[in-house]
C-alpha cells in the first residue's frame, strides 16, 4: 500500500542533519534510531551545548551542576522533515585536550518522533486528523473486504476456489464535533515469487480515523490513540497495543492540474504507548472478544464510549492496568481492583446517604458534644455520612444483569464482606491474616469482573450478552470457578 505507516514494532534508522530551533544554521550530522519497542536515540557527530554556565566576569564562566534538555530538535532525513520531542542528552564526548583532534559526539534520547513534519511542540495545532491501528481491531470490527469461495462437485471439493474483494462501507460517528470513522484499506492481489513456490496475497487493514473540527496538537492525537486503545483492550479483555499512528497535516491538500485533489500530507508518530502492538502476531481467538461492532454498532458505541470513559476514566485506567501491567504480588492487585470498584461507584454518581442528612446532622452534633474540645477536630473529620466500601460493592453488583451476576458471584453479600475485610486489613494493618492467597486471587478476579460488567452495562451491552460472557468466556469461567470455591460462606455461617 502506498504511504504505508511506520509500525511501532519495527525498528528503523534515519541518517540526516539535526539542529535546535533557535540555531537553524548550526546543523549536525547524525543518525536517529528507533528500536521497535518505543525507544528513540539520536547519535550526533558533534554536540549541542548541554552544559550550563554562569557568567562570573567578562570572559570568565563557571560550569554549574545539571545539564540542558531540549523540548524540540529538528531534522531532515530521507527526504522527510523530522521533529524530535522531549530530548535529553545522555552521553557527550568532547575532544578538548585530546592527543588526536576528532569530532565531538553526543547521544540524545527522545520521547517522541514525528516523521514527516516540523512542529514547534506538543501544543502546536498542526494536524487536522489522526489515523490509528490497534491490535485485533479487525476482529472487533467484525467486517472484512475479503471473502473466499471453495468449489465443490457433488459435495466434494473439486480444487477450484477464489478470494475476492468487496469494499466495505466506512462507519462513522460524531462526538462533540469530532468524527470517528472505522474504515478498511486493502490491496489488490499481488504475488510473492520464490524458487520453490508462489504465494498470492491480499491485505486488509482496519483503522480508525479521527478528524477534529479545528486543527489540533500532538497531545490531542495521542489522547485519541489512547481512547481507541482502551476501547479495544476492554473489548478483547487483554492488553491491546498500538500498531501505528499517522497524522494529517493542516493545509497540505492540493489540486492537481487534472482537477483531482491531492490528499493531505501525512506524518508518522513514533513513541512509547502503554503497549506496542505486534502487527504480525496471530490474532486472538474470537471467543475471547467481549463485544464487537455487530453487537454494539460503531455509530452507537463511540458516543457512549466517549461519555463513559470520560466519567469513569480512573476506574477504567485501574482495571485495564491489571491487563497491561499486572503486579506480581496479589496484594497490589487487590488494592488496584478494589480501588477501581470504589472509583467506579463514585464516577457513576449513584451514591446514597446511609442516614437522612437532617438526622445525621443531629447525631453528629450530639456525638461531638461529648468529645473534649482538644479532640473534637479529629472526631469531626472521621464522622461522615458516606457509604462504606461494602455498601459500594453491593451497589455495583446490583447494576448489571442479575442473572450474569448470579452466575459470577455465588453470594454477593459474602463477597462484599470478604473483599472489604481483605482491603481494610491490608490498608490499615499491612497484612491479611484471615485470607489465603487463593481467596485473595478469587477476590481480585471477581471484583475486576464486576467492574467490567458494570462498564459493559454502561455501554449498553444487552443482558443476554452479559450472561454469555460469564458462561462462555474462558477467563470469566475461571473466575466463576474461583468464586464458587472461595467466596461462599462456610456452612456454619449459612
Label the model's feature ranges.
Residues 1-239, 469-472:
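Long, contiguous, compositionally biased segments that the model treats as domain-scale units
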Residues 3-14, 22, 34-48, 52, ...:
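Short, charged N-terminal helix-start/capping segments
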Residues 46, 259-494:
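Amphipathic, oligomerization/interface secondary-structure segments
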Residues 202-295:
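Internal metal/ion-chelating core segments
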